[in-house]
Amino acid sequence: MGEASPSIAKDVTELIGNTPLVYLNKVTDGCVGRSRAKLESMEPCSSVKDRIGYSMITDAEEKGLITPGVSVLIEPTSGNTGIGLAFMAAAKGYKLTLTMPASMSMERRIILKAFGAELVLTDPLLGMKGAVKKAEEIQAKTPNSYILQQFENPANPKIHYETTGPEIWKATAGKIDGLVSGIGTGGTITGTGRYLREQNPNVKLYGVEPVESAVLNGGKPGPHKIQGIGAGFIPGVLDVDLLDETLQVSSDEAIETAKALALKEGLLVGISSGAAAAAAVRLAKRPENAGKLFVVVFPSFGERYLSSVLFQSIKKEAESMVVEP
């Protein structure tokens, strides 16, 4: 992990972390509180999962569980964790096999293969549970293999406790009132939230999940379009007792908010960032939150979603363009 410094990084791992925060200014009509976005889209591989790609591999190495050039790493992913692991595996010399629901974007498939990962697609109707099961099947027949288990691995929230939390606390000069984060594995909000609560017990922690798969609110798992959150089960690394509230955002609202962030704020982000922003704006409109500062995590860059429903209409428009004489 890197530290803020003008020096040249020794390798790509030193580029991870220390992402900037920026105020949301144009999608905030009716808000009485303020929102700052933590731009994890500016990680070296464009997502918050770069942090846990680094932490889970490094932790396993330090414990003697894996060895470069010998161990085969296996992991179920919705895409971004896979990419975070893939660039680390390439840099360190590991073979990596990933299982991923076929509903995830084409960009994810291409990027994973560009880093040399072996990719196995699973039934999209089975969601992440199907990807997890397939990963376990592959491990059972693969010698020298190791599943990193992002949904259960303590190294996931630990890296956010050690880096994301302190970064936010420092950037806001300790004036943060609430953290808003979409919940995939739950590692970001658990680790970051623990650190922030230790600094100020009054900091509120707000999760975000798809309304179509509102498991944390007692609902049933279901298909949705917000890639990266709403796994359909409660992950082991998520500390649900930390959460003050988990807001529900529909796929359509997440998509429209992500589009608005590009058009009004100049921020090209993914669908889960749209979901988190929609939740943050909703919170900032509540009268009791007047004058309060929310930090909302934007997990990934929008270019990873060009083939997805997020840019479907624009893609069709671009494809139908003709050359002007």
UniProtKB/Swiss-Prot annotation:
Q: Where does pyridoxal 5'-phosphate bind?
A: N80, G184, T185, G186, G187, T188, S272
Q: Where in the cell is it found?
A: Cytoplasm
Any single Gene Ontology cellular-component annotation: cytoplasm
Q: What is its EC number?
A: 2.5.1.47
Instruction: Please give one Pfam family short name.
Output: PALP
Under InterPro entries, the record lists: Cys_synth, Cys_Synth/Cystath_Beta-Synth, CysK, P-phosphate_BS, TrpB-like_PALP, TrpB-like_PALP_sf
Enzyme kind, highest EC tier: transferase
Q: Which GO terms describe its biological process?
A: cysteine biosynthetic process from serine
Quote the pathway field. Answer: Amino-acid biosynthesis; L-cysteine biosynthesis; L-cysteine from L-serine: step 2/2
- Catalytically driven reaction(s): O-acetyl-L-serine + hydrogen sulfide = L-cysteine + acetate
**One Gene Ontology molecular-function label:** cysteine synthase activity
Q: Which cofactor does it need?
A: pyridoxal 5'-phosphate
The keyword Ribosomal protein appears for this protein: no
Q: What UniProt keywords apply to this chain's record, in alphabetical order?
A: Amino-acid biosynthesis, Cysteine biosynthesis, Cytoplasm, Pyridoxal phosphate, Transferase
Q: Does the keyword Chaperone apply?
A: no
Task: Kindly give the NCBIfam families that the UniProt entry links to this protein.
Answer: cysK, cysKM
Q: Which proteins does it associate with, and in what oligomeric form?
A: Homodimer.
Q: Which family does it belong to?
A: Belongs to the cysteine synthase/cystathionine beta-synthase family.
Q: What is this protein called?
A: Cysteine synthase
Which organism does this record belong to?
Zea mays (Maize)
